[in-house]
Amino acid sequence: MPPGPWESCFWVGGLLLWLSVGSSGDAPPTPQPNCADFQSANLFEGTDLKVQFLLFVPSNPSCGQLVEGSSDLQNSGFNATLGTKLIIHGFRVLGTKPSWIDKFIRTLLLATNANVIAVDWIYGSTGVYFSAVKNVIKLSLEISLFLNKLLVLGVSESSIHIIGVSLGAHVGGMVGQLFGGQLGQITGLDPAGPEYTRASVEERLDAGDALFVEAIHTDTDNLGIRIPVGHVDYFVNGGQDQPGCPTFFYAGYSYLICDHMRAVHLYISALENSCPLMAFPCASYKAFLAGRCLDCFNPFLLSCPRIGLVEQGGVKIEPLPKEVKVYLLTTSSAPYCMHHSLVEFHLKELRNKDTNIEVTFLSSNVTSSSKITIPKQQRYGKGIIAHATPQCQINQVKFKFQSSNRVWKKDRTTIIGKFCTALLPVNDREKMVCLPEPVNLQASVTVSRDLNLACV
């Protein structure tokens, strides 16, 4: 395929990275004696594939052991009775070791007693994106040969969990396909979009590639794939424009990569923290924000999926549905966790125009806001508000009836209504808690009410 706009984009990304971090920053940590590290390539000699498999074990999480053949594995700390996590990085513009990989490995080993194997294909993933794409099939074959060596040692297919980042997610999918979809799990962290959005299921990550396939989407409008590719597909904050990421090109390389890499940091955070990153199935992000998807009954029979090392993502039904889009909101920084609440406002009298009400939750100087729109000639409206603190710690709610009149004309319109809320998932109306007194609102005037909710 001839070079296109995506190739130019990645060359620009490489230049920006060199300008921003290439000539400064801390030196990489010095490997311990007898410990192996990732290879280093550059823009001009990193296109030919050369693969290393680095084993990390719970007893020495910072020391990578180079394991190529069966004898290396037998003489290493590899334990065939434990689960095996295989991490596959994606395209590397400058041929450098991924900045997130060391923390990812340490966090995995702290979170679970397993063998962690990092697949180093720095040589083969560097330079031009399309060259890296061409290496995917060959890399997948090399990884499958390596996994066959693990099976000979007594490892079961179902105990293997591949975690692929960006382009590495599709590598994982192809490896899973070579094993007939019998590997235990594949997690795709913002699977790459360029060259894969319109690819066949045989060429990209797909729900048939493992017993359970999940994908976390954070950059669907740029470097990530925009279509569902697993049994469960998390579209975080709608799958794009992550909070805390730069919104202007002037931010340089961070502008290009922040949304894309948020999936990695979310997953690491889910391993480190107990606060669940829970998501809810819905037809669209807009419908989710409008409060139309309040539980996980359809299709998960009330078991809401969660990001992290949870069996089948917490989904407890068989057979697993495929390509289910689920949505959640997050904060701008770790631990990213947000609680989701339904908010409703019931008008006492119908109106001949749309009614817009801003609702704000307050607790310990932390605020979270959402807007409720009540269509004309309808009695009530609803929406979703996300808050970092548990709902029972929210002690006040503020309302602002937003005027639709001209700025220079004072609007004295008043409305009266009832406010109710409930923490998601909402499986029945009995969970709703309403303010004991009606709320009187005048246009553009903020009104506060105490909110007393019990902890459960």
Swiss-Prot record:
The reaction(s) this protein catalyses: a 1,2-diacyl-sn-glycero-3-phospho-L-serine + H2O = a 2-acyl-sn-glycero-3-phospho-L-serine + a fatty acid + H(+); 1,2-di-(9Z)-octadecenoyl-sn-glycero-3-phospho-L-serine + H2O = 2-(9Z-octadecenoyl)-sn-glycero-3-phospho-L-serine + (9Z)-octadecenoate + H(+); 1-hexadecanoyl-2-(5Z,8Z,11Z,14Z-eicosatetraenoyl)-sn-glycero-3-phospho-L-serine + H2O = 2-(5Z,8Z,11Z,14Z)-eicosatetraenoyl-sn-glycero-3-phospho-L-serine + hexadecanoate + H(+); a 1-acyl-sn-glycero-3-phospho-L-serine + H2O = sn-glycero-3-phospho-L-serine + a fatty acid + H(+)
EC number from the UniProt entry: 3.1.1.111
Active site positions: 166 (nucleophile), 190 (charge relay system), 260 (charge relay system)
Glycosylation-annotated residues: 365
Signal peptide: 1-25
Cystine connections: 245-258, 282-293, 296-304
Domain of life: Eukaryota
Cellular localization per UniProt: Secreted
Annotated Gene3D superfamilies: alpha/beta hydrolase
Keywords: Disulfide bond, Glycoprotein, Hydrolase, Lipid degradation, Lipid metabolism, Secreted, Signal
Pfam families per record: Lipase
Cross-referenced InterPro entries: AB_hydrolase_fold, Lipase, Lipase_LIPH, Lipase_N, TAG_lipase
GO biological process: lipid catabolic process
Cellular component annotations (GO), alphabetically ordered: acrosomal membrane; extracellular space
Similarity annotation: Belongs to the AB hydrolase superfamily. Lipase family.
Function: Hydrolyzes the ester bond of the acyl group attached at the sn-1 position of phosphatidylserines (phospholipase A1 activity) and 1-acyl-2-lysophosphatidylserines (lysophospholipase activity) in the pathway of phosphatidylserines acyl chain remodeling. Cleaves phosphatidylserines exposed on the outer leaflet of the plasma membrane of apoptotic cells producing 2-acyl-1-lysophosphatidylserines, which in turn enhance mast cell activation and histamine production.
Protein name: Phospholipase A1 member A
